[in-house]
Regions:
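Residue-level signature of the transmembrane alpha-helical core
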Residues: 26, 30, 64, 68, ...
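Helix-terminus/linker motif at the lipid-water interface of multi-pass membrane proteins
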Residues: 30, 34-53, 122-129, 185-192, ...
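Small-residue-rich hydrophobic transmembrane alpha-helices
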Residues: 52-112, 149-168, 258, 262-266
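Hydrophobic transmembrane alpha-helices of multi-pass small-molecule transporters
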Residues: 64-67, 179-184, 209-213, 259
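Alpha-helical transmembrane segments of multi-pass membrane transporters/permeases
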Residues: 103, 158-184, 195, 199-202
Length: 267
């Protein structure tokens, strides 16, 4: 029996499968929080207050990008789950490839913008000049790995759309612990400071993305699209944006509020 068939939620009773599907989602959100928490705790303890301020002031900016990606991936997963339930595998493959191509393009553009504009953005929210060099270094490194953040969210939401919410959680937990050990190694042992903390986060996210990709290739033949990975469907992209924009903006508005408050406090 294939992995997909084992997680088919269109058959049988719904309550227990629904609870079993939901719990890993909740746990995954909790472990997602450990990334920035680990960075803040370890940097604050072993580097100093200014380094902690650099991480703290960068967090809302980083979260805006992550939440935009997460929201759009959620929109895509709604469509993918509907297509999978209807056994419309041709549309499903086009949905997957379209989301992947659009998300990678968005991630690259967003990363390049932040590499160029990190300092002006930090000044716009009135981050103290003394904290800008470290905050800008942290942001640039984090955004260089934004494509890994997208790919994990994309692959994880694709597996969830097909009924498997446990496997993405296992990879996320592994990545979260590796991030903690990476922080300790790069910050405490190598003494790379804020940059080391960002490198640890990017490396752990890259590994999480790699593990998802390997698992999908071995266990979920339906998602091994081959040349179909390069199919781009504008109409499906429009539907994805329509479904995902509400969720993305709802979450981003909270971070924008934090940025406004932060800029007022920094005045």
């Amino acid at each position: 029996m294939s992995t997909i068939e084992k997680h088919d939620m269109t058959q049988g009773k719904i309550l227990l499968p629904l609870v079993s599907f939901t719990i890993p989602l909740v746990l995954g959100n909790l472990f997602q929080l450990t990334y920035n928490a680990a960075d803040s705790v370890i940097v604050g303890k072993y580097v100093g207050e200014q380094a902690l301020a650099a991480v703290g002031t960068s967090t809302p900016i980083m979260n805006i990008a992550i939440l935009l990606i997460s929201g759009m991936c959620m929109g895509a997963s709604v469509l993918m789950s509907s297509q999978y339930g209807a056994k419309d595998y041709d549309t499903l493959s086009r949905q997957i490839s379209t989301t992947m191509l659009a998300g990678c393009g968005f991630s690259v553009v967003f990363s390049l913008l932040m590499l160029l504009l990190a300092n002006p953005v930090l000044r716009l929210i009135r981050v103290p000049e003394t904290a800008i060099p470290e905050a800008a270094a942290y942001l640039r490194i984090i955004f260089m790995g934004l494509i890994f953040t997208f790919m994990y969210n994309f692959l994880a939401n694709t597996m969830r759309a097909l009924g498997d919410s446990k496997t993405p959680l296992y990879f996320l937990v592994t990545s979260a612990f590796l991030n903690i050990f990476g922080d300790l190694f790069f910050v405490v042992v190598l003494r790379w400071g804020v940059a080391g903390s960002a490198i640890a986060t990017v490396c752990s996210e890259g590994l999480c993305c790699l593990l998802c990709g390997i698992y999908i290739k071995k266990k979920i033949p339906l998602l091994c699209l081959g040349k179909k990975w390069w199919v781009f469907d504008k109409s499906l992209l429009g539907k994805t944006v329509s479904y995902g924009s509400t969720s993305a903006m709802q979450q981003v508005c909270l971070q924008l509020g934090k940025l406004i408050i932060q800029s007022v406090v920094n005045t």
